[in-house]
Amino acid sequence: MSVYSLKELAEHIGATSRGNTDVVVDSIAPLDKAQANQLTFISNAKFRPFLAQSQAGILVVSEADIEFCSANSNLLITKNPYVAYALLAQYMDTTPKAASDIASTAVIASSAKLGTNVSIGANAVIEDGVELGDNVVIGAGCFIGKNTKIGANTQLWANVSIYHEVQIGSDCLIQSGAVIGGDGFGYANERGQWIKIPQTGSVIIGNHVEIGACTCIDRGALDSTVIEDNVIIDNLCQIAHNVHIGTGTAVAGGVIMAGSLTVGRYCQIGGASVINGHMEICDQAIVTGMSMILRPITEPGIYSSGIPAQTNKEWRKTAALTLDIDKMNKRLKALEKKLAD
């Protein structure tokens, strides 16, 4: 197991240090559980009372946190401890790669082009015309369809399916079970019979994109579905055909986006939200969890819908009242008219 000194970690993230710069840690743990061989951090002032009692070998803190620490504590001092934690977690990460070499059971078309240091796991299928950049990692059981291109340093965990002619940028991470480039939900109806419309567009994914487990991103009907750079999409999301998601947007688990939706840059979409298609959401919009967005959002801000959980008794009363809203509205208008007369 690797160990990391206070001096090394401070230099890595550009932080200042206090205490024994030779002290070493081998992992990261929560504030209340960290031991002498571990690093921990504080990102919320409400936890300051616990700093003095921490047994951690290294504490990552802000200037404002220092007075709450023991005089003997070894400190990494930074403006944003949570960002520092993220950077240190990457530096100390022990997660194995999805594959470490090219497995003998991988099926790789002779026309596929592989960059240097590519790894492909057992039983993966790489079809004709595929291009894999340097240091790409393809996990066991993945399927990469014809003429798909995947940029350098991108990693796919086991059992990811990438259909034909998809483009994926560099430094992306795609979790197990994701399906990218499957058919969009396109049909015409003729006297009750559904007629399938072939989806001849593609999916274009930018750089530094992360896609969660079992998320589906459908290919476009004619044009492409587009996911711009630095987008993060959680597990179990449905991104329909011709959706366009702007740079830096975050999409939490279980979100459903209908076809031809355009989501702006640096938006945050809360979990289990449902968003109508053929409309736009502006840059920097925040949608809270379980919202149903049926109309365009044109101004940055926080948007919500839905009824927060209540006791069953309270909810039944609320539901009953909603049935009477129309009657109450008519009575109110009648009273207003009577008063006006």
UniProtKB/Swiss-Prot annotation:
Gene Ontology CC terms: membrane
GO terms assigned for molecular function: N-acyltransferase activity
PANTHER family given in the database record: UDP-3-O-ACYLGLUCOSAMINE N-ACYLTRANSFERASE, UDP-3-O-ACYLGLUCOSAMINE N-ACYLTRANSFERASE 1, MITOCHONDRIAL-RELATED
Record-linked Pfam families: Hexapep, LpxD
Pathway connected to this protein: Bacterial outer membrane biogenesis; LPS lipid A biosynthesis
Alphabetized PROSITE patterns for the sequence: HEXAPEP_TRANSFERASES
Gene: lpxD
Protein role: Catalyzes the N-acylation of UDP-3-O-acylglucosamine using 3-hydroxyacyl-ACP as the acyl donor. Is involved in the biosynthesis of lipid A, a phosphorylated glycolipid that anchors the lipopolysaccharide to the outer membrane of the cell.
EC number, as in UniProt: 2.3.1.191
CDD domains attached to this UniProt entry: LbH_LpxD (cd03352)
Protein name per the record: UDP-3-O-acylglucosamine N-acyltransferase
EC category: transferase
Keyword annotations: Acyltransferase, Lipid A biosynthesis, Lipid biosynthesis, Lipid metabolism, Repeat, Transferase
Family: Belongs to the transferase hexapeptide repeat family. LpxD subfamily.
An individual GO BP term: lipid A biosynthetic process
Subunit structure: Homotrimer.
